């Protein structure tokens, strides 16, 4: 049996140096046209530190929540300009993406059960592509292997986010949308990009407080998973479409956005440690195979969506990519992506959270299917 080890704490001065290096890398990335450079730079720097120093770095909730609000607002802005008929047009691509995701997640869970002899509970929660932190919490409730679920979920998230800049550049070149190409690869004026509008800042504060108040008031009747993503998007669309709130208030800019991207990058890269990778070294080939299958199936689904419904290949891939929802939405915003990305990704998160809520029944079903047959009398 593997002995659990407590993650080492990170000295404050280490965090300062890592942040400084990450900011410099991000500013350089912006100059050369790397999309969502703050996510990529912070993921790379903090990820390397977490692995080689064997120190886990996880942003606290009080820091993660504002970042989630900022990114949710960024991605809700395009939805406010959509007519109802256009939203209905997203139904078929969304359905196709969800079906492919569920099939691949099911096969991945089956593979972990059969090949690595993981329990059904651990396998299901480790492979559901959506809401990594929620799956880790569920693993404790279902007595699954929380360490394995954490490793698999955040390894998938790290790989997906780390490969996004390459896929954005590659698929932009293959696409036919000049806007997407310029958005994905255009160089930025670093100084001008630091300008932060007071409207966007106020919008983030109001949105965050509104979601917080709503969850507190309704807690006795029901709870909403990922509220600072789902409710922020819902409330902002209602505010603009029905209440006439100017769009500037749901469009954060400048330092506010860069800080949110940096926090998401730390979350994606700082969770994996050398100790965690060493503990499950034998399972890594299967885990990486599962991640590769997820990315490959997303590319296949993206090709079908692009050909059948006329979207760019980049938008279709960002809509179907499995996991790292905040990072994916950030890259979609940076590349001038179609609202399809937000619609499909949000629906994927909702679908995975619903499946996660029924995880005990799913685990029970898989357990019965793989239970040893009773001995013959």
What residues fall within each predicted segment?
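Long hydrophobic alpha-helical segments that form multi-pass transmembrane helix bundles
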Residues: 157-210
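Membrane-interface helix termini and inter-helical loops of multi-pass transporters
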Residues: 81-89, 173-196, 244-252, 276-279, ...
């Amino acid at each position: 049996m593997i002995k659990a080890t407590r993650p080492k704490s990170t000295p404050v001065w280490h965090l300062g140096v890592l942040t400084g290096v990450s900011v410099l890398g991000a500013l350089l990335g912006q100059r050369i046209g790397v999309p969502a450079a703050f996510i990529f730079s912070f993921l790379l720097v903090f990820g390397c530190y977490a692995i080689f120093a064997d120190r886990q770095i996880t942003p606290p909730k009080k820091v993660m929540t504002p970042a989630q609000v900022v990114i949710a607002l960024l991605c809700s802005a395009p939805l406010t300009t959509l007519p109802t008929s256009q939203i209905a047009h997203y139904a078929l691509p969304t359905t196709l993406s969800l079906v492919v995701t569920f099939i691949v997640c099911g096969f991945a869970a089956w593979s972990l059960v059969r090949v690595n002899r993981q329990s059904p509970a651990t396998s299901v929660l480790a492979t559901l592509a959506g809401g990594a932190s929620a799956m880790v919490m569920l693993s404790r409730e279902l007595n699954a292997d929380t360490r394995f679920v954490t490793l698999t979920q955040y390894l998938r998230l790290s790989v997906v986010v780390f490969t996004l800049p390459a896929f954005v550049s590659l698929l932009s070149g293959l696409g036919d949308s000049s806007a997407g190409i310029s958005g994905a690869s255009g160089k930025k004026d670093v100084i001008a990009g630091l300008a932060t509008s007071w409207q966007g800042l106020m919008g983030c504060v109001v949105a965050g407080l509104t979601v917080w108040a709503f969850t507190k008031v309704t807690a006795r009747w029901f709870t909403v998973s990922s509220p600072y993503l789902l409710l922020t998007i819902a409330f902002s669309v209602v505010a603009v479409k029905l209440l006439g709130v100017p769009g500037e208030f749901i469009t954060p800019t400048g330092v506010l956005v860069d800080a949110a991207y940096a926090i998401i990058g730390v979350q994606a890269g700082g969770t994996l440690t050398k100790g965690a990778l060493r503990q499950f070294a034998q399972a890594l080939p299967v885990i990486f195979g599962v991640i590769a299958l997820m990315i490959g199936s997303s590319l296949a689904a993206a090709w079908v969506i692009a050909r059948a419904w006329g979207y760019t290949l980049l938008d279709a891939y960002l809509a179907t990519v499995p996991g790292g929802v905040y990072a994916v939405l950030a890259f979609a915003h940076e590349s001038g992506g179609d609202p399809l990305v937000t619609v499909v990704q949000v629906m994927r998160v909702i679908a995975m959270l619903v499946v996660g809520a029924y995880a005990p029944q799913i685990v029970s079903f898989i357990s019965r299917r793989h239970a040893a047959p009773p001995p013959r009398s």
